From Swiss-Prot:
This is Fluoride-specific ion channel FluC 1. One of its GO terms (biological process) is cellular detoxification of fluoride. The lineage of its organism: Bacteria, Bacillati, Bacillota, Bacilli, Bacillales. Belongs to the fluoride channel Fluc/FEX (TC 1.A.43) family. It comes from the Bacteria. One of its GO terms (molecular function) is fluoride channel activity. It comes from Listeria monocytogenes serotype 4b (strain F2365). It is a multi-pass membrane protein. Na(+) is not transported, but it plays an essential structural role and its presence is essential for fluoride channel function.
Length: 118
């Protein structure tokens, strides 16, 4: 049981470090009101998690990569906070674009990941 916690913890740490690195890189390259870093992270995360779920990985890899790494990599809470910040700035065009694109492309990415992982 302890091994499972360690697997999830290490996976989450690696996923969070990758998320941070991507976020810093994207924010340094593109100065825009649209939160491209979180958008990119969550869309690629949706694809990768779909792929992992439908692949033939064993339970140890599912814990490490699926629960741990992808849990640390993707960020639902940042998505919501950034959405609220856009609302407070009354930047509704960007807000609704962000919400719509994240949900639509997230579903498409997850579907493609599921199909490719089979």
């Amino acid at each position: 049981m302890l091994v499972n916690f360690v697997l999830v913890g290490f996976g989450a740490a690696l996923g969070a470090m990758l998320r941070y690195g991507i976020s810093v890189l994207v924010k340094s390259k593109w100065k825009t009101n649209f939160p491209f870093a979180t958008f990119f992270i969550n869309i690629t995360g949706s694809f990768l998690l779909g792929f992992l779920v439908s692949s033939a990985l064993g339970p140890v890899w599912q814990l490490f990569l699926g629960t741990g790494f992808m849990g640390g990599y993707t960020t639902f809470s940042t998505f919501k906070v950034e959405s609220m910040e856009l609302k407070w700035k009354t930047n509704y065009r960007v807000l609704f674009s962000y919400l719509g694109c994240t949900y639509v492309f997230g579903l498409i990415a997850a579907f493609l990941g599921l199909m490719l992982g089979v």
